[in-house]
C-alpha cells in the first residue's frame, strides 16, 4: 500500500513537472534539442510556407487560362516553381536537423539515465529491496521506462513540435490568405478534435484490457509448458486447453470492440470533408462578394484544415509526455533517494589503524524487518565468535540464522543492541573497507552472465591471473575450468546457466577466497547438492575456512558437527550453545534434531570423509573428470555441462523451417469468408474516396475561377454535396472494414493458438529439451508470431486492398484528365516512394537493432538487481557499472548510426516532395500555355496524384511486415505440420485392466539432443506388480531416466519397456498414463485454488474424494486451517505455500488418481527435517493403503529401508538388486554406500 501511494504521488507530481524528463541533459544535449526544435518548427512551417507559392500558381493558372501565352504567365510559373526548389533545399537542412538532433540527444540522455539509475539502485540498502521495490519493477524501469523516455525524445517531441508548428502557422497563414474565412471556420475545429480524441482514448482503454486478458492466457500456457512432464503425466492437456480457450474467448471479444473503435476513430477523420463543404460554400461567397481570389481561398482553407488536423494529432501525442513524465519521475525518485546504508560511500565511517583480526560480537541484538514490522526476527540475541573460531548456526526455518549472517554484513541495522568486529561497532566502520574483509558463500551461487574470469574478479577487482588461478585451485575449480573451451574466458550464460550446480558453487567459493577474507560466512552452501558432491564441496570449504573466523548456517549435521561452537537458535534467540559433544550430552533440542536427522540419513560418517581424503578421490580432484560427470548429471536435462558439450561438437537438433504459402491459412480463414468479403469491398470503396476527394478539391478550385457567379455557385453546391457524402461514406466504410477484418483476424488468431497448443501437447518431451523450444520461446510463438499472422491477414491486407484501390483509381483518373502531366507525375514518384520508404523502413530496422543492442545491457542490469545482495556484499557496484557501460557501447554505436539515418531520411523525403511539386507545376504550366489542357485539369491531376507516392511508400514499407508475416506463418505451420511419435494419443491398445508389472529389457538409451552420451547401458529390471522398488546411485547414473521411460516421456530404440508384458509403445498412451502418477522433487503447483491443483488431470472428482486424498497426503489439516480452505489461492507456481505444503498437495493429486503405478522421484530431497517427516508419513500411508507398484528414486538411503527391493545403478547399469538388509550384508557397493550414509536405526 505504501509503495502504491508513493507511485500515485509520483504520478500526480510528474503530470505537472514534464521538465523532469530533461533533467539529465547537459549543454551538448541542450544545443541538440534547440537545433532539433528549430528543425521541427521549420519542418512544420514548410507546408504553410509552400502554400504561398501554391496560391500564386493557382491564381496565375486560374486567371490566365484565357490568355496563357502571355509572358507574365510563363515567368510567374517558372518563378514559383523555382521557389519550390529553394524551399526543398531549405527543408532538407531543417528536417535533417530535426531527425538527427533529436535522435542523437535521446540516445545520449537515455544512456545517462540508465547508468545513473542502476548505480543509484545498487547503492540502496537491502531493506529497500524488501519493502519499497521489487526486482521486476527495477528491471521494468531500466528497460521499459527508459524506452518510453527515448521514444518521447527521439520521435514524439519532434512530431509534437512539428504539428504544433503546423497548427500555429496554419492559423496565421490562413488568416493571411483570408482572415474572414479563418474567423468563420474556427468553431469547426471542435469537429476535427473531439471525435478522434474520444475514440482514440477508448481504443487505448480497450488495448490495455486486451493486453491484460492475454497476459492471463499466456500465464496459463507458460506454467503448463514449464512443467510439461507433469501435464503429460496427469493427462491434464484437455483441462489446460479448456482454460486457455475461455480466456482467448474473452480476448477475442475485446478484439472485436477494438475493431469497432478503430473504425470510428479512422472514420471520424472524414469530418474534414464536411468542413471542406462549408469552406467551399463560404469561400465562393468571398470570391463573389469580397473579391477574394480562388488561390488564396484554397490556401486559407487547406492551411486551416491541416492546422486543425495537426492540432488533433499533437493532442494525442500528449499522453506520451504524460507516460514519459511518470516514468522519469519514478526514475528520479529512486536516483534521489539517499541510501540509509551506502556501501559505496567512503566518506562515512573510519578505518582502524590495525588490520582486522576477526573477532565478532552480537550483544543483545533485536531486529525487526521494515517489510514485516509485526514480526520480531531476532530478540535479545547474544553471541561471541573469537578470532579464527568456527561457529555453526542451527535451528528451524525462520529462527534467524540467515539474519545473523545479514547483520554481520550490515545489510540491516539492529533496532537494539550492537554488532561489533574487533570491538568496533560496525556502524562506525567504513562499510566498503569492512566488507572487503568478509567472504560469503551462499546457497544461491549468484553468478553473472559473463566470463568465469570476470565472475572471479567480482571478489577482487584488480586481481592478477596468478591470484585467480590460486583461488580456483583452492576451491577445487581449476581442473574443470581449464577443460572448458575457453578456459577462464568461457562465458557461463545467464546466471551461470551453462554450468552445473557443483561447478557454480566452486566458482562462488573461489570468488570468496580471492578476497583473502578475515571472516568467512557460509549460508547453506551445500544444501542443494547430492551426497557425494556435497562432501567434495564441503571438503573445499573446510580447507578454505581453516584459520579464519567462520560462521556457518546449515540444517545438515554433517556440515556443522566439526564447528568449534554450535548455536541452536529458536525464535530469534540462542537456545543452546556449545560443541557437538557438549550439546549431545545435554540431550536437549540439538540432540533431538540430530536423532531426527539420523533417522532420515542426513549425517555423513567419518568413513565417507576418509574416502574423500583418500588418494583415489584426490586424484579425481586433480583431473575433475568424475566430478564433472557427477555434478552435471543431477537431472536428465543436464547429463554434462552444455559448455563441455559445445567443446565436444555435440550435434544439436535443428529443424529447418521451409517457407509456407499464404494459401495454407485459407482453411483457418474460410469460416469468416462473409466478413472477409465485406471487409474487402469496404476497403476497396474507401480506397476510392481519397482520389474522389482530391478530384473534388481540384474541381472546387477551378470553380473559384468560373466565368460567372451562377456557374461558380452551381459547381460549388455540387462539390459541397460530394464532400458531405464522403463524410458519411468514410465513417460507414471504416466501421465495416475494420470490424470485418477484426472479426476475421481475431477468430483466426484464436483458432491458430488453440490448434498450436493442442499440437504442442502431443510432442514428446525431448522436443522441449531443445533451446529453441524452451517455454519462453513457445510462449513467444503463441503470442508474437500468431499476432503477426493475424496482423498480416487482417490489418495489412485491409491496408493493401485500400492502397491498391486508391492508387489504381487515382492513376486512371489522372491519365483520363491529362495523360501527359499524369505520366510525368507517375514517373517521378519512385524517387518520392524511395525516400518515404527509406525513412520508414530503415529507421524501423535501425530502431530494432538499437533495441536489440540495449538488451545486452538490460540483461547485465537484470542479473545485478537479481543478485543485489551479493553485489552489495562484494562491494561490486563499480564493477557492475563498468560491465554495463561496456555492454552499452554497441547500443551507442547503433544509436549514432540511427541518428544520421533519421536526419537523412527525414530531410530527403521532405526535400524531394517539394522538388516534385516544382516539376509538376512547371510542366502543368507548360501544357496550359500550349493549350493542351486547362487550369482545372492541372489542379485535378495534381491533387489526385500528389499523395499517391506517399501512399505507395506506406504500403511499400509493409514489405518488412510481409517478410515477418511469411516467417511467422512458416513458424506456425512448422509446429502444426511436425510429426510426433505421441501425436495420436488415442492410438494403441487399451488393456482391460492393468496389473502394474514393469519390465525394462536390455535398454541402451541416450537423450535425443545428446545422442553421443549413453545414459543407460544394457539396462534390465523386472518390477513385480504390487511391489515397491527403490533406485539408488550417484547423480547422473540414470535413476530419473528410468522414471521418464516408464512414463514414456521418451521412446527407446534399443531394448524395450513393457507393462504387463505388453510393449509400452503399443499401449494407448493417454489411457496408460491415467493409471500412473508422478511426484517429483520440485512439486508443481499452478496458480488457482488448492482444489484446482488437486483435481488436475481428474476434474470430475467429487469434493469428498478431494478431501479424502488430502487426508491421505497429510494435507487436510493445514488446508482446513486456512481461511478459505480448499478454495485458497496458491499464487503463481504456489508461492503462497511452503515447500512441504506444495509437496503434500502434489501427493494428494497423485493419490486422487488411484494409480496402479506410483513414481516418486527425489520427493523429499529439498525439504527440511520436519517437512520431510510429514511427507514420508503421507507416502507410507498411501503405499500401505493400496496395492500399487511403486518406484522410488532417492539419495537418502534410509527412506528406502522398508521397500520390497532396491536396485543399485552405476553408470546406467543395474549392478545389485535385493532387499535393503540383503544388499547391506553382502558387502558390495550398496553396503559401502549404506555405511557412508550412516544407516543405523
UniProtKB/Swiss-Prot annotation:
PANTHER family: ABC TRANSPORTER DOMAIN-CONTAINING PROTEIN. The gene is ABCB8. It is found in: Membrane. The keyword Membrane applies. SUPFAM superfamilies: ABC transporter transmembrane region, P-loop containing nucleoside triphosphate hydrolases. This is Putative ABC transporter B family member 8. GO terms for molecular function: ABC-type transporter activity; ATP binding; ATP hydrolysis activity; ATPase-coupled transmembrane transporter activity. The chain crosses the membrane at residues 24-44, 82-102, 157-177, 183-203, 263-283, 297-317, 686-706, 716-736, 797-815, 821-838, 899-919, 933-953. Residues 33-323, 676-964 form the ABC transmembrane type-1 domain.
Amino acid at each position: 500500500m505504501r509503495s502504491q501511494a508513493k507511485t500515485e504521488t509520483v504520478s500526480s507530481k510528474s503530470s505537472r513537472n514534464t521538465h523532469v524528463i530533461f533533467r539529465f541533459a547537459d549543454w551538448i544535449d541542450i544545443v541538440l534539442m534547440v537545433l532539433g526544435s528549430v528543425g521541427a518548427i521549420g519542418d512544420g512551417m514548410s507546408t504553410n510556407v509552400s502554400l504561398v507559392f501554391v496560391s500564386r500558381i493557382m491564381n496565375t493558372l486560374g486567371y490566365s487560362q484565357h490568355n496563357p501565352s502571355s509572358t507574365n504567365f510563363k515567368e510567374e510559373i517558372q518563378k514559383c516553381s523555382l521557389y519550390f526548389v529553394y524551399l526543398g533545399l531549405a527543408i532538407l537542412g531543417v528536417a535533417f536537423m530535426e531527425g538527427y538532433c533529436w535522435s542523437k540527444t535521446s540516445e545520449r540522455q537515455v544512456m545517462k539515465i540508465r547508468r545513473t539509475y542502476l548505480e543509484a539502485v545498487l547503492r540502496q540498502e537491502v531493506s529497500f529491496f524488501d519493502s519499497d521495490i521489487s526486482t521486476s519493477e527495477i528491471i521494468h524501469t531500466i528497460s521499459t521506462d527508459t524506452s518510453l523516455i527515448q521514444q518521447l525524445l527521439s520521435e514524439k517531441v519532434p512530431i509534437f513540435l512539428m504539428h504544433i508548428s503546423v497548427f500555429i502557422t496554419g492559423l496565421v497563414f490562413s488568416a493571411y490568405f483570408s482572415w474572414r474565412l479563418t474567423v468563420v471556420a474556427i468553431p469547426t475545429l471542435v469537429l476535427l478534435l473531439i471525435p478522434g480524441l474520444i475514440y482514440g482514448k477508448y481504443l487505448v482503454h480497450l488495448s490495455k484490457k486486451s493486453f491484460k486478458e492475454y497476459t492471463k492466457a499466456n500465464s496459463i500456457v507458460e506454467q503448463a509448458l514449464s512443467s510439461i512432464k507433469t501435464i503429460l503425466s496427469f493427462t491434464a492437456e484437455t483441462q489446460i486447453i479448456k482454460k486457455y480457450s475461455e480466456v482467448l474467448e474473452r480476448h477475442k471479444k475485446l478484439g472485436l470492440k477494438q475493431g469497432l473503435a478503430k473504425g470510428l476513430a479512422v472514420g471520424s477523420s472524414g469530418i474534414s470533408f464536411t468542413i471542406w463543404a462549408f469552406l467551399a460554400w463560404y469561400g465562393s461567397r468571398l470570391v463573389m462578394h469580397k473579391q477574394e481570389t480562388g488561390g488564396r481561398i484554397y490556401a486559407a482553407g487547406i492551411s486551416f484544415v491541416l492546422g486543425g488536423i495537426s492540432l488533433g494529432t499533437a493532442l494525442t501525442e500528449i499522453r506520451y509526455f504524460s507516460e514519459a513524465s511518470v516514468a522519469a519521475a519514478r526514475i528520479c525518485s529512486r536516483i534521489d533517494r539517499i541510501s540509509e546504508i551506502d556501501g559505496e560511500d567512503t566518506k562515512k565511517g573510519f578505518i582502524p589503524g590495525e588490520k582486522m583480526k576477526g573477532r565478532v560480537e552480537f550483544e543483545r541484538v533485536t531486529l525487526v524487518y521494515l517489510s514485516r514490522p509485526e514480526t520480531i526476527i531476532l530478540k535479545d540475541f547474544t553471541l561471541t565468535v573469537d578470532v579464527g573460531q568456527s561457529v555453526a548456526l542451527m535451528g528451524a526455518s525462520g529462527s534467524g540464522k540467515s539474519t545473523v549472517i545479514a547483520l554481520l554484513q550490515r545489510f540491516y541495522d539492529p533496532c537494539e543492541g550492537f554488532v561489533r568486529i574487533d570491538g568496533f561497532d560496525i556502524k562506525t566502520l567504513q562499510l566498503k573497507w569492512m566488507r572487503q574483509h568478509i567472504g560469503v558463500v551462499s546457497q544461491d551461487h549468484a553468478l553473472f552472465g559473463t566470463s568465469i574470469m570476470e565472475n572471479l574478479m567480482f571478489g577482487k577487482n584488480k586481481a592478477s591471473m596468478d591470484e585467480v588461478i590460486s583461488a580456483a585451485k583452492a576451491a577445487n575449480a581449476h581442473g574443470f575450468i581449464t577443460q572448458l573451451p575457453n578456459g577462464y574466458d568461457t562465458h557461463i550464460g545467464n546466471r551461470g546457466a551453462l554450468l552445473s550446480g557443483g561447478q557454480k558453487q566452486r566458482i562462488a567459493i573461489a570468488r570468496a577466497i580471492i578476497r583473502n577474507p578475515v571472516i568467512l560466512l557460509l549460508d547453506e552452501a551445500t544444501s542443494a547438492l547430492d551426497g557425494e558432491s556435497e562432501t567434495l564441496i564441503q571438503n573445499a570449504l573446510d580447507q578454505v575456512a581453516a584459520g579464519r573466523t567462520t560462521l556457518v548456517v546449515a540444517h545438515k549435521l554433517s556440515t556443522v558437527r566439526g564447528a568449534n561452537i554450535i548455536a541452536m537458535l529458536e525464535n530469534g534467540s540462542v537456545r543452546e550453545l556449545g560443541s557437538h559433544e557438549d550439546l549431545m550430552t545435554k540431550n536437549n533440542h540439538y540432540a533431538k534434531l540430530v536423532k531426527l536427522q539420523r533417522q532420515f540419513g542426513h549425517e555423513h560418517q567419518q568413513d565417507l570423509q576418509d574416502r574423500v581424503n583418500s588418494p583415489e578421490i584426490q586424484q579425481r580432484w586433480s583431473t575433475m573428470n568424475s566430478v564433472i560427470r557427477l555434478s552435471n548429471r543431477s537431472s536428465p536435462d543436464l547429463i554434462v555441462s552444455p559448455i563441455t558439450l559445445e567443446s565436444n561438437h555435440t550435434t544439436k537438433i535443428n529443424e529447418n523451417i521451409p517457407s509456407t504459402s499464404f494459401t495454407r491459412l485459407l482453411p483457418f480463414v474460410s469460416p469468416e469468408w462473409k466478413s472477409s468479403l465485406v471487409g474487402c469491398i469496404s476497403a476497396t470503396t474507401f480506397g476510392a474516396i481519397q482520389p474522389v476527394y482530391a478530384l473534388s478539391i481540384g474541381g472546387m478550385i477551378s470553380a473559384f475561377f468560373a466565368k460567372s457567379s451562377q456557374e461558380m455557385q452551381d459547381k460549388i453546391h455540387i462539390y459541397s454535396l460530394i464532400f458531405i457524402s464522403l463524410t458519411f461514406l468514410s465513417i460507414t466504410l471504416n466501421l465495416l472494414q475494420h470490424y470485418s477484418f477484426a472479426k476475421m483476424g481475431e477468430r483466426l488468431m484464436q483458432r491458430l493458438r488453440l490448434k498450436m497448443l493442442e499440437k504442442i501437447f502431443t510432442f514428446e518431451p525431448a522436443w522441449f529439451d531443445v533451446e529453441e523450444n524452451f517455454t519462453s520461446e513457445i510462449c513467444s510463438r503463441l503470442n508474437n508470431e500468431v499476432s503477426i499472422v493475424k496482423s498480416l491477414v487482417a490489418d495489412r491486407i485491409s491496408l493493401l486492398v485500400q492502397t491498391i484501390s486508391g492508387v489504381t483509381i487515382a492513376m486512371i483518373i489522372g491519365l483520363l484528365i491529362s495523360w501527359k502531366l499524369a505520366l510525368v507525375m507517375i514517373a517521378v514518384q519512385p524517387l518520392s516512394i524511395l525516400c518515404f520508404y527509406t525513412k520508414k523502413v530503415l529507421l524501423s530496422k535501425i530502431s530494432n537493432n538499437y533495441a536489440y543492442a540495449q538488451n545486452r545491457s538490460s540483461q547485465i542490469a537484470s542479473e545485478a538487481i537479481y543478485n543485489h545482495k551479493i553485489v552489495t556484499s562484494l562491494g561490486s557496484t563499480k564493477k557492475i557499472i563498468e560491465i554495463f557501460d561496456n555492454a552499452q557501447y554497441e547500443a551507442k554505436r547503433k544509436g549514432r548510426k540511427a541518428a544520421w539515418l533519421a536526419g537523412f531520411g527525414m530531410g530527403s523525403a521532405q526535400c524531394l516532395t517539394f522538388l516534385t511539386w516544382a516539376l509538376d507545376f512547371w510542366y502543368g504550366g507548360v501544357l496550359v500555355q500550349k493549350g493542351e489542357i486547362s487550369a482545372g485539369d492541372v489542379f485535378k491531376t495534381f491533387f489526385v496524384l500528389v499523395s499517391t507516392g506517399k501512399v505507395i511508400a506506406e504500403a511499400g514499407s509493409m514489405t518488412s511486415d510481409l517478410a515477418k508475416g511469411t516467417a511467422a506463418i512458416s513458424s506456425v505451420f512448422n509446429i502444426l505440420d511436425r510429426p510426433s511419435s505421441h501425436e495420436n494419443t488415442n492410438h494403441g491398445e487399451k488393456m482391460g485392466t492393468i496389473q502394474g508389472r514393469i519390465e525394462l529389457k536390455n535398454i541402451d538409451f541416450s537423450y535425443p539432443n545428446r545422442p553421443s552420451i549413453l545414459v543407460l547401458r544394457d539396462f534390465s529390471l523386472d518390477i513385480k506388480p504390487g511391489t515397491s522398488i527403490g533406485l539408488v546411485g550417484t547423480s547422473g547414473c540414470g535413476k530419473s531416466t528410468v522414471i521418464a521411460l516408464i512414463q514414456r516421456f521418451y521412446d527407446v530404440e534399443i531394448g524395450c519397456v513393457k507393462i504387463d508384458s505388453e510393449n509400452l509403445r503399443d499401449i494407448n498412451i493417454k489411457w496408460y498414463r491415467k493409471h500412473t502418477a508422478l511426484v517429483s522433487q520440485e512439486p508443481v503447483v499452478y496458480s488457482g485454488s488448492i482444489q484446482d491443483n488437486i483435481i488436475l488431470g481428474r476434474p470430475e472428482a467429487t469434493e469428498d474424494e478431494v478431501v479424502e486424498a488430502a487426508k491421505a497426503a497429510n494435507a487436510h489439516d493445514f488446508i482446513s486451517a486456512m481461511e478459505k480452505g480448499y478454495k485458497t489461492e496458491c499464487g503463481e507456481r504456489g508461492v503462497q505455500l511452503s515447500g512441504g505444503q506444495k509437496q503434500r498437495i502434489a501427493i494428494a493429486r497423485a493419490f486422487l488418481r488411484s494409480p496402479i503405478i506410483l513414481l516418486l522421484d527425489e520427493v523429499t530431497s529439498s525439504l527440511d527435517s520436519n517437512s520431510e517427516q510429514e511427507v514420508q508419513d503421507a507416502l507410507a500411508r498411501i503405499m500401505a493403503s493400496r496395492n500399487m507398484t511403486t518406484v522410488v528414486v532417492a539419495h537418502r538411503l534410509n527412506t528406502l529401508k522398508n521397500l520390497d527391493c532396491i536396485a543399485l545403478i552405476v553408470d546406467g547399469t543395474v549392478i545389485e538388486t535385493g532387499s535393503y538388509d540383503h544388499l547391506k550384508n553382502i558387502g558390495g557397493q550398496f553396503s559401502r554406500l549404506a555405511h557412508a550414509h550412516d544407516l543405523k536405526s
